[in-house]
Amino acid sequence: MQDASRADAFQIRRRQFLHSGALLLTAAANIRCGATEADPTVRLRIGLITDLHYADKDTVGSRHYRETLTKIAEASTELKKLSPAFMVELGDLIDRADTVSTELSWLKKINQSFSAICDEQHYVLGNHCVDTLTKQEFLGAVGQKQAWYSFDRQDVHFVILDSCFRSDGTAYQRKNFEWTDANIPAEELEWLKSDLQQNKLPTIVFAHQRLDVADNHGVRNNADVRKILQESGNVRAVFQGHSHQNDLHEISGISYCTLAAMVEGTGPAANGYSSLEILSDGSMRLQGFRRQQSRSFS
């Protein structure tokens, strides 16, 4: 009887252990969407976040502005574990405010959290970033010199684009624009063409307004932009935000990947952020968290 009691007790403890382990695995799976163990062939890892829309104001529709602080805290914890080489914020870091001082205060608060994830950050301007602020005010506050530029890391070329211009070439600022009138001006197009002609490395482009659609979320002259990207022969993918939903199109061999907005929805499960891994064989893997879908790019 004593041996039977010991056996029963062992089985109970075993079931309790297995149940606890299953709960832990389930909790971890709920944070990462399609996540895998870090691959030893990863040569560069980049953190991506878009459409945070932080603001100290009440919820409007599905946009829970104040919850962004909690969501970015989780993103910071998870992404720090992966040690990204740099972070890219794909636009709309803040939401609109009535005054310059209010927008700057919101920007300072959210950027403290974003810039703490790793040592290097890059910011794509979104229409909400310069709703009240000028571009110089926003860029000065986050410590970035230019709105569009390029740089190289680990034999990969990266391009940051700025589509916050009206059709007449006027830069967004001080509520002087309609959000549906997004354009890349001639000067920037000329720079982009020259930059890509001089570059022979595989290239990734970061944008806010979409370069792959003709609806209100698209850059009005995005066909001109795509032509330049295609003719370069080196552009692998474009990562963008603005429409707040997961989406993916391939046009002429270039992947246009739209990322989920962090601001949408309430609670931990409504978060969205990702890690882009560039592998030694030239392929790429987007590891999505929460609402962000994971993707593979050959």
Predicted feature locations:
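Active-site neighborhood of phospho(di)ester-bond hydrolases with catalytic His/Asp-centered motifs
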Residues: 49-50, 87-91, 121-127, 204-207, ...
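N-terminal secretory signal peptides
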Residues: 1-12
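N-terminal export leaders
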Residues: 12-30
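N-terminal active-site segment of His-dependent metallophosphoesterases
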Residues: 34-103, 194
